[in-house]
């Protein structure tokens, strides 16, 4: 099954058998699992996941690939293919009381907004394993003070624990991307954050990192005054990249003290 990659869909197909096996080993699918694969593409990972005996829901936007996947996997395993945009897909419609294990080689051009879309559905997700641009994985896994630390780092940490698993070179794909990729594991916290907390933390984080070269005293002006920052135990002279998730949660609580 060979498909001409479409640039507008951000298609870079994984072709390296060794990397595919590494991903499957990292996921460790079991027959009792309910898997969701985002962007199955040519089905190379799909095939290996199905061999575990797990139930697999595949979400693919490219109608030509959907048709090819249906032909290739007709009568194979427990597979259901959904033609549609993962950015608009509601996982709760297929969760039916079960938590989902989500995997995929995500299109790099929409990876960050897609991650936030999935975070909004974190209550039905058991874990996630994704191939992403290495820079995005570095941001997901960064802690306060790290070079890659930013808005994505803080918001991801609010929802889950991120773990960088391994890097993947451009030569493992067709066509070859211009960047190094990496596989990340995201495990949601036992208790997901409530919508109110997410909204407040996001407001503080966006303001802080929107002017990251400024001190919080200036970056958060109009949102929080210095008294509120001190009350939260935060130095108004600090900068966005110096604060941990706990610090941002503390600041967010000062929005409605």
Swiss-Prot record:
* Chief site of localization: cytoplasm
Q: Name one GO molecular function term.
A: 16S rRNA (adenine(1518)-N(6)/adenine(1519)-N(6))-dimethyltransferase activity
Instruction: Write out the residues that bind S-adenosyl-L-methionine.
Output: 12, 14, 39, 60, 85, 105
Q: Which UniProt keywords apply?
A: Cytoplasm, Methyltransferase, RNA-binding, rRNA processing, S-adenosyl-L-methionine, Transferase
- Keyword flag Mitochondrion: no
The record's annotation in SMART domains points to: rADc
* Pfam families for the chain: RrnaAD (PF00398)
Q: Name one GO cellular component term.
A: cytosol
**Where, per UniProt, does this protein localize?**
Cytoplasm
In terms of domain of life, where is this protein from? Bacteria
Q: What is its EC number?
A: 2.1.1.182
Reactions catalysed? adenosine(1518)/adenosine(1519) in 16S rRNA + 4 S-adenosyl-L-methionine = N(6)-dimethyladenosine(1518)/N(6)-dimethyladenosine(1519) in 16S rRNA + 4 S-adenosyl-L-homocysteine + 4 H(+)
User: Which EC class does it fall in?
Assistant: transferase
SUPFAM superfamilies referenced in this protein's UniProt entry, alphabetically: S-adenosyl-L-methionine-dependent methyltransferases
Q: What does this protein do?
A: Specifically dimethylates two adjacent adenosines (A1518 and A1519) in the loop of a conserved hairpin near the 3'-end of 16S rRNA in the 30S particle. May play a critical role in biogenesis of 30S subunits.
The family line of this record is: Belongs to the class I-like SAM-binding methyltransferase superfamily. rRNA adenine N(6)-methyltransferase family. RsmA subfamily.
Q: Tell me what this protein is called.
A: Ribosomal RNA small subunit methyltransferase A
**What is the source species?**
Methylococcus capsulatus (strain ATCC 33009 / NCIMB 11132 / Bath)
